[in-house]
């Protein structure tokens, strides 16, 4: 499987062969589903909370007499059918976190990479290592690659380059992705992936291992 390679200015150089350890493993939609579902669950705070009738302040006395008023009998103004009353079976704080095995996470990442490669949505670029903050220079790279205006772009780089990270922050639809901490959603929900040469080697070392 091949991909287009660009220099650090975003100019096309040649087509390169993608490593089979990453891009010849097949696609498992089930693994992708499980991984994204677990990531979404782990991002939930679970702090939602409502009060039942025993927790709502007030309502300890009957609002009116049991008989003689012509109205339906009531025991408390905090009953669920009153405005301001307790909530029946409402949400309470809970932990939504979900555990995902390393093998499933690995299979999901490889499946997404294979899917993007099959759709010709992966590009390889020489390592971009700016020595200062420059949003314009990063945007010009994407513009030269002709993907600046073609939906979301995931920029996968090796490690944390603060100059590069901050330079990508103000570019709409561009997501900075650290190859050492890949999140499935960050690579799945992008139309195109731009992977630096160092990041490709990092992914190869990390995900080509068995287990």
UniProtKB/Swiss-Prot annotation:
Lineage: Bacteria, Pseudomonadati, Spirochaetota, Spirochaetia, Leptospirales
SUPFAM superfamilies attached to this UniProt entry: Ribosomal protein L4
Subunit description: Part of the 50S ribosomal subunit.
Pfam families per the UniProt record, alphabetical: Ribosomal_L4
A GO cellular-component term linked to this record: ribonucleoprotein complex
BP GO annotations: translation
Domain of life the protein comes from: Bacteria
Role this protein plays: One of the primary rRNA binding proteins, this protein initially binds near the 5'-end of the 23S rRNA. It is important during the early stages of 50S assembly. It makes multiple contacts with different domains of the 23S rRNA in the assembled 50S subunit and ribosome. Forms part of the polypeptide exit tunnel.
Protein family (similarity comment): Belongs to the universal ribosomal protein uL4 family.
MF (Gene Ontology): rRNA binding; structural constituent of ribosome
Disulphide linkage map: none
UniProt keywords, alphabetically: Ribonucleoprotein, Ribosomal protein, RNA-binding, rRNA-binding
Protein name from the UniProt record: Large ribosomal subunit protein uL4
HAMAP family xrefs: Ribosomal_uL4_B (MF_01328_B)
Region (Disordered): 42-73
């Amino acid at each position: 499987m091949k991909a287009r390679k660009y220099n650090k200015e975003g100019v096309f150089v040649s087509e390169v062969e993608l490593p089979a350890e990453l891009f010849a493993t097949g696609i498992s939609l089930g693994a992708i589903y499980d991984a994204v579902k677990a990531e979404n669950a782990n991002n939930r705070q679970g702090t939602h909370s409502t009060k039942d009738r025993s927790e709502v302040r007030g309502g300890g006395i009957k609002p009116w007499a049991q008989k003689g008023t012509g109205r339906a009998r009531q025991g408390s103004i905090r009953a669920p059918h009153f405005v301001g009353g307790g909530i029946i079976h409402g949400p309470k704080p809970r932990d939504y976190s979900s555990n995902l095995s390393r093998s499933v996470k690995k299979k999901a990442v490889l499946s997404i990479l294979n899917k993007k490669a099959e759709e010709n949505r992966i590009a390889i670029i020489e390592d971009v290592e700016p020595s200062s903050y420059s949003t314009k220079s990063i945007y010009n790279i994407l513009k030269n690659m002709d993907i600046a205006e073609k939906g979301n772009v995931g920029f996968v780089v090796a490690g944390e380059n603060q100059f590069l990270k901050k330079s990508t922050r103000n570019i709409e639809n561009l997501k900075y992705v650290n190859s050492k901490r890949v999140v499935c959603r960050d690579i799945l929900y992008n139309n195109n992936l731009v992977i630096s040469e160092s990041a490709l080697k990092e992914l190869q070392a990390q995900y080509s291992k068995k287990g």
